[in-house]
């Protein structure tokens, strides 16, 4: 929970984000092509609700899609979509990231049936939360049901990092070593 955001009301955050979407980020002419949120393992807390609603409102006004990180093990995707809907955002404008981290095929199907996109976006280290073979099985099942256009396959940038090791190992890795192919799914 971010103190800077907790201290500000939704209107103030909204105005800052909308200005950056319409006029440029931090005084530049660079504008976002997508909005982004994240929901913690605790699910949609009061602060998360405020931020989801705010980002949803800005995304609607600026005509931007939304990517939202979430923890599918607590099934917060339902609440996330409901908050976005209360801000006027249709589910087909939302990607729920990390949905493939769980092996709950019914949950994944519910989200795509609702119209959202889902991310199987951490496949390279799926062994930590959900074995890759389970994710592949769920992807095949979803594709066989006609949801191929609702699934984002990737592996999060974190797959390049030694997240599960020490910081020293992380910063000492050579990410520009072209002899290492980080684009595999095992």
Residue ranges and their predicted role:
Residues 96-102, 121-141:
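Active-site glycine- and acidic-residue-rich loops that bind
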Residues 1-60, 117, 124:
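Active-site gating/metal-coordination segments in enzymes
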Residues 62-65, 85-92, 112-119, 147-149:
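Glycine-enriched alpha-helix->loop->beta-strand junction motifs that scaffold or abut catalytic
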Residues 65-72, 93-100:
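Catalytic beta/alpha-barrel core
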Residues 176-186:
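Mid-to-C-terminal alpha-helical segments outside catalytic/metal-binding sites
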Residues 46-50, 73-87, 105-113:
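Distinct, well-ordered alpha-helical segments
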Residues 121-122, 148-170:
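Short acidic/histidine-rich active-site segments
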Residues 49-54, 132-139, 169-172:
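Charged helix-capping and loop-helix junction motifs
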